[in-house]
Design a protein with these regions (language model features):
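N-terminal helicase ATP-binding lobe
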Residues: 1-208
Length: 208
């Protein structure tokens, strides 16, 4: 609730009117927990994006998006890797952009497609059964989620979910500095949330 409030409050104040900043960062210690929370938060972000589109005069034209930033074993680092997985229906790759399987609204399976001209992964609800009932299918051309590192760097998400081990790499990944408002015209986040703080020990905890 606090995160969504901050997103809309900032837009009402025009703070993010001309920026590409990440406003909320939530960090988890366990990758499995991060993936689980990603599917839950996706429904909230989709609802927020629908609300923004319906009230663009108040909240601006910039899309409200959700990003997932975890290890390479879970999600691809590059768009080209993600496109190969999506374009090959028989792919058994463990690293995949398909981290959200079902539509948060109607629960039907989502369709992932690769858009090479913009290096973008489109995520759509196209189920015929929910054509007239699914708010996401009716109001969003593509779900506002990003699961490929390259796409995250090029289009900073409004809300970023990350694991602390991935986040620790920010000191040697110049392209990731945008998440903290340290690159280009991006603004720093309004809120950083660390989940399960007591689990962070040793050098990793010191670094993060």
């Amino acid at each position: 609730f606090i995160s969504v409030f901050l997103i809309f409050y900032s837009r009402l104040n025009k703070k993010f009117e001309n920026t590409k900043g990440t406003q909320i960062i939530m960090r988890y210690t366990l990758r499995a927990l991060t993936i689980d929370q990603f599917s839950r938060i996706a429904s909230t972000i989709c609802a927020a994006e629908i609300l923004r589109k319906e009230n663009s005069n108040l909240f601006g034209d910039k899309e409200i998006t959700l990003g997932l930033w975890v290890g390479q074993k879970q999600t691809p680092n590059w768009y080209s890797e993600a496109a190969k997985v999506i374009n090959n229906p028989n792919s058994q790759a463990e690293s995949t952009p398909r981290q959200l399987i079902n539509c948060p609204c109607c629960k039907n399976q989502l369709l992932y497609t690769a858009q090479d001209d913009e290096k973008k992964i489109n995520v759509e609800c196209v189920s015929p059964e929910s054509k007239n009932t699914c708010e996401i299918q009716k109001k969003l051309n593509s779900l506002p989620i990003l699961t490929v590192d390259e796409c995250l760097y090029n289009n900073l998400p409004t809300f970023l979910l990350a694991t602390i081990d991935k986040f620790a790499q920010i000191i040697r990944k110049d392209e990731a500095l945008g998440f903290l408002g340290k690159k280009g015209f991006s603004s720093p986040p309004s809120l950083i949330i660390q989940d399960e703080l007591h689990l962070i020990t040793g050098p990793l905890g010191t670094l993060t």
